[in-house]
UniProtKB/Swiss-Prot annotation:
Name of protein: Tetratricopeptide repeat and J domain-containing co-chaperone DNJ1
TPR repeat segments: 33-66, 67-100, 102-134, 176-209, 211-244, 315-348, 349-382
Biological role stated in the UniProt entry: Endoplasmic reticulum co-chaperone required for the of virulence factors such as PG1, the major endopolygalacturonase produced during the infection of tomato plants.
Pfam family, one: TPR_17
Biased composition (Basic and acidic residues): 464-474
Signal sequence range: 1-21
Length: 521
């Protein structure tokens, strides 16, 4: 039998915390009100606000006319963010003690936080604050900033809107209107995550409103590509309102997309690009995930559930996945999706890889190298896919500055033996000196061209020589190092051999010269 000690410890702690929580039944009925207030103050000093509230409740129940007890309970409510209950207590204080400045001051601050400028101004006046006091000045500045933010939004001046709204929110931190206004302007600027942060504040201020849930969920899921948090937010919407049709619809839609997305990811990781491509783009019988998401995003933007200017990261991911699937399966429409992937995201790895290949094929070697190096930098974990193509580009660039035997014969780099032989015969028929004259090709030009054709065929028809050429080593290059020079001379001394072969009827005349002394054979 195995015991989960960690689990037991957590359970025990939770049990003890519950058991030790103070309840009204724990307070002796005969404890004097003064003692109750002392106990409440002691708990407050320890940061135990909930326990303090239990004692304040008991004290007020026994003496509901004590305005100071109500005032202290109101401040305790404030510290917990329970503003509606605090406001109620402050109003009770004023009904018992009209003109109590402390209550007016607290109500002024509460109205200011809510962005209720006129009510806050009135309460500051009742609290005895002069028109030139710091509180009045701050309030007027915040009120003006809120007005300027509204005007900037209407004029499409998004940065000004965000700046002015921020100034107002310093004072009116619990104003739903200002938070929603700044969220809107931030969305227009493309600051999606900051805008969502503002909407999270709105949720706390308007707990019964499902609209922020929908915007946060849809924007997180589609615009940010954060599937987990997007679904998590719409679940909170259903917890807030289990009967919400719009929340149910969005939850079902997002779950379906997430399931298909993960399935396609698995297909690509298992090397099934053709299957993945069909799932992404669709077939005659089934719509694909890409068109489905396009349609969903269009509808969500129309309903203002996603900001109209937001980038759609989920769609960018899907387009790049399609580029990958079509590239790996050599699909004829790979260029279409890879080009779109780069338009949506200039740092698309698969888009860059496809572009680099296309540039290499078009003999844009410098551009291909730059593109492929960028791809390798973006995804260091994918270097095994980039490096072989990058090496080809470097070799092709080097070859382009010397001889290109493939180009001489007019064949592709991956041509097989049959294609090479066929190209050789075709070129020979055109440029053979005996036949070139009939086609108007000068004899000297034909001989020169035929020599190049023979040289190219000699290399490409020999697997070993061709392999060397493909690695960037031209077998006919005059720049290759002499194995008998320098340190490579097996006899030392740094003196080269001289090899001469003479013609003539007397047979070869071969001489080797070593160290300045000839040896004749």
């Amino acid at each position: 039998m195995h015991l989960n000690l960690a689990g037991l410890a957590v359970a025990a702690t939770a049990f003890l915390a519950t058991a030790s929580a103070l309840s009204p039944q724990d307070i002796p009925a005969d404890l004097p009100v003064s003692n109750l207030l002392t106990k409440a103050q002691t708990h407050l000093s320890r940061g135990e606000t909930n326990e303090a509230l239990v004692y304040y409740d008991a004290a007020i129940a026994r003496d509901p006319t004590n305005y100071l007890s109500l005032f202290k309970r109101a401040t305790a409510y404030l510290s917990l963010g329970r503003t509606s209950q605090a406001t109620e207590d402050f109003n009770k204080v004023l009904s018992l003690k009209p003109g109590f400045e402390g209550a007016h001051l607290q109500l002024a601050r509460l109205r200011a936080k809510a962005g209720d400028w006129d009510a806050a101004k009135a309460q500051y006046g009742l609290a005895g604050k002069a028109p030139k006091s710091a509180e009045f000045v701050e309030l007027e500045e915040a009120k003006l900033a809120a007005h300027l933010a509204d005007m900037a939004s209407k004029g499409g001046k998004w940065e000004e809107c965000v700046s002015h709204a921020g100034t107002a929110i310093v004072v009116a931190s619990r104003s739903p209107h200002l938070r929603e206004l700044r969220a809107h302007c931030r969305f227009e600027l493309g600051d999606v995550e900051l805008a969502l942060s503002d909407l999270q504040h709105v949720l706390h201020m308007k707990p019964g409103d499902t609209s922020p849930h929908i915007v946060i969920s849809a924007t997180s899921f589609y615009a940010l590509g954060d599937l987990e948090n997007g679904i998590g937010q719409v679940k909170k919407c259903l917890q807030s309102d289990p009967d919400s049709k719009i929340c149910k619809k969005l939850h079902k839609q997002e779950k379906k997309v997430e399931k298909a997305y993960k399935k396609i990811q698995g297909q690509l990781s298992r090397g099934q690009p053709t299957t993945a491509g069909r799932a992404l783009v669709g077939t005659a019988d089934d719509s694909g995930l890409v068109p489905d998401v396009r349609k969903q995003v269009e509808e969500l933007k129309k309903n203002k559930s996603i900001p109209k200017t937001a980038r759609i990261q989920l769609l960018e991911n899907l387009i790049e996945m399609t580029c990958q699937a079509y590239t790996e399966s050599s699909h004829k429409e790979a260029a279409k999706y890879c080009d779109e992937s780069l338009q949506l995201n200039p740092d698309s790895f698969w888009g860059l890889l496809h572009k680099g290949k296309a540039q290499l094929k078009s003999e844009l070697y410098d551009a291909a190298i730059a593109t492929l190096e960028k791809a390798a930098e973006i995804r260091p974990d994918q270097k095994e896919k980039v490096n072989p193509i990058l090496n080809k580009a470097h070799i092709a660039l080097k070859r382009s500055k010397t001889k290109d035997y493939y180009k001489v014969l007019g064949v592709e780099n991956d041509a097989d033996e049959r294609q090479i032989k066929s190209a050789y015969r075709k070129q020979s028929k055109i440029f053979h000196p005996d036949k070139a004259a009939k086609q108007g090709i000068p004899k000297e030009e034909a001989e020169k061209k035929m020599a190049s054709i023979n040289e190219a065929y000699e290399v490409l028809s020999d697997p070993e020589l061709r392999a060397r050429f493909d690695r960037g080593d031209d077998p006919n290059s005059q720049e290759r190092p002499n194995p008998f020079q320098g340190q490579g001379n097996p006899f030392g001394g740094g003196h080269p051999f001289m090899f001469q072969q003479g013609g003539g009827g007397g047979g070869p005349n071969i001489k080797f010269q070593f160290g300045g002394q000839p040896f004749g054979f």
